[in-house]
């Protein structure tokens, strides 16, 4: 759902919820938790990214 990749003092949080990286409540909570914890892990910056093609289609809205 969320890959955490450390690049020295930069933490990359890569969305990994194919096919469109829709933001579910669980993913939003995980993003929030990861950003809040980043300084404790030595990160001086956080970059939120996704795989090639599509960053995110937005919120995961039930039909």
What residues fall within each predicted segment?
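Conserved CoA-thioester-binding segment of acyl-CoA-metabolizing enzymes
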Residues: 1-51
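Glycine- (often His-adjacent) and acidic-residue-rich active-site loop
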Residues: 50-63
């Amino acid at each position: 759902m969320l890959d955490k990749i450390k690049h020295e003092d930069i933490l990359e949080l890569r969305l990994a919820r194919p096919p469109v990286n829709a933001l579910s409540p669980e993913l939003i909570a995980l993003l929030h938790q990861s950003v809040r914890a980043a300084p404790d892990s030595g990160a001086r910056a956080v970059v939120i990214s996704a795989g090639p093609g599509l960053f995110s289609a937005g919120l995961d809205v039930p039909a």
